Every structure is written in C-alpha cells, then in structure tokens.
Amino acid sequence: NDGDRFIIYISCEDEHLQLFKKELADYSAEIICIAYKYNLFNDSVSAQGLSVQERELLLSAIIAADFEDDKRFVKSRIQFDTKIAVDGLFNFRLQSILKKWEEISTYIPQHFTREELKEFIGYLISEKRGRKVYIKDDAVYDGQYRKMERSNLLPKGYENKLLKEVLLSGAGEIFISGSINKSEYGRLSDFFGDKIFISRG
C-alpha cells in the first residue's frame, strides 16, 4: 500500500509471460469498465424514486449496457512491458472514454420509477438475447463455464449480488441447476421472467 495506491508484485515463468500479460490486460480493463465507471455514475446519477438497492441495480445495468465495447476499447489502449498503472492508464490514455461516460450520464433521467427500471433492464436483456449464463449453487458461470466474479469490483454491502453478476455478464438467458437462494431467484425472475430455464436433473 503506497498511500491511496495498492501495488501488487507478481512473478511468473518466462514461458507464461505473454499469457499472463494478456490476462492482466483483461482484468485491468474490467477494473476500469466496472469500478471506475461505477464511481463516475454513482456521483452523477441520483435516480430519485428508487430505493438504495434498486439504484445499485440501475448502476449495474448502466455499466453492463456498453461493457463489451468499453472493454475492447480500453484493452486497445493498454500498452505495458512489465508494469501497468491502472489509475495512470485511466487518467492519461482514456480521456475519450471518460468523456463518453460523462456525456451518457447527462442523458440519464434524475428520477426513475421501479417500472422504468424494469423496462430498462428488460431492454438490455433483449439486446443480449443470444448470450447464456449458468447458475449453480448461487454462482454464475459464462458459456465456457468460467466462474463470473465481476460484481466483486462493485461496492460491498448491498443486496442483489447474484442479479448484478448476471447483469454484468451480459446475459440474455439464464440456465439454473443445483440449489439457489429463493429470494435471489425471486429477484432474477422479476427481471428475466421466461428467460430463466431450470434443470430438473
């Protein structure tokens, strides 16, 4: 910990270096496109009319809306040899995406109803209709059965973690097997409805 900065040192074998750099670039892009984007919209979107938990869902949905495009752009701007400073990358090489997010924030209504929130999330789901995610024992997996943990980049202490994880995955359809918390299932069905499929096996 260096003041407000956290520094992580990682070593790997030379033969794994290129793969490691690729993974590091991928995760650095996710930090920016989720955590940094959340901070910007959290400061600029009041979303009056929604509860605290509903507002958090709205912010997650806003992040998810352009997540893949944002991530591709951020990764295209990442250049490093053996060190990468995420804050420096954002502050000096990503001003264009910051301006894009700031412009988007000006178009978001400052008052939302719960029905409008459902409509907005429903629109996102329809746009992602071909993308499948899998839920097993309250964990979310992508189409390659890799565990999704993007919601860990959001502030802790709020409900709807499973629903936010599904939103951040860009899911259009959900396949559930194993056990799932009833209240979490209720929240999922509230937004995804007939896009949820349950395995009885």
Label each PLM-derived region with a short phrase:
Residues 1-160, 164-166:
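Conserved mixed alpha/beta catalytic, RNA-binding, or beta-rich assembly cores of soluble enzyme
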